[in-house]
């Protein structure tokens, strides 16, 4: 393996110029410099400022593509992934940021990819507050990988780090309207083995930023239902109960007593109690 491998970074974006620029700035601050960033704009109606910003950077590592037709987040992710030239690859959402050491932290654990599907790390969460250092933000610690947990819910998050050829082999499912990350991570785990968790927090998840959210509730339900039908043969009885309970929560549909008794488990019972308490 090369000591200074090229890392490809893919970023889909749509009508969030200021947030996308913030994400790009966090990539530019990386303490590891051998990367390329492929930004695919999914036919935004407002995009000139973002294009001008990238052009003014005059950084050959950054490529900006504005599509003439809106094709959806998964399609533009795949478009960027197939253009990637790096040995390794990872993604960034246009409303998130990286800590300066994200790429170097992942590279320090790259040997784990020989026996693991991908790497993932903890995150920080920002709910709009002003901060000077990421470490001052609340930590979003992720669970160490376990099949029992992962087959019930996405414990990985929204981004992973792995060999580029693995993403090119799997790609995102353009038919899914929700759970797209969960879907590709699950397929990678089935194909390449368990993932490896890195303990450092290297990403800042921004929530409640006031801009348009990409997934609406009806799409989320139909997409998650599609995801469940696609993978239900992989799930054991406990995982199926958990997944079906999730579908009822997404749809916000009242369960009959018969359905409730059918899906009842210790974990679902706790979720039900938390819901009643408004947590």
Swiss-Prot record:
NCBIfam families: PRK10018.1, WcaA. Pfam families: Glycos_transf_2 (PF00535). To R.meliloti ExoO. InterPro entries: Colanic_acid_synth_WcaA, Glyco_trans_2-like, Nucleotide-diphossugar_trans. GO terms for biological process: colanic acid biosynthetic process; lipopolysaccharide biosynthetic process; slime layer polysaccharide biosynthetic process. It comes from Escherichia coli (strain K12). Keywords: Lipopolysaccharide biosynthesis, Transferase. It comes from the Bacteria. This is Putative colanic acid biosynthesis glycosyl transferase WcaA. The lineage of its organism: Bacteria, Pseudomonadati, Pseudomonadota, Gammaproteobacteria, Enterobacterales. The keyword Transferase applies. Pathway: Slime biogenesis; slime polysaccharide biosynthesis. GO terms for molecular function: glucuronosyltransferase activity; glycosyltransferase activity. The gene is wcaA.
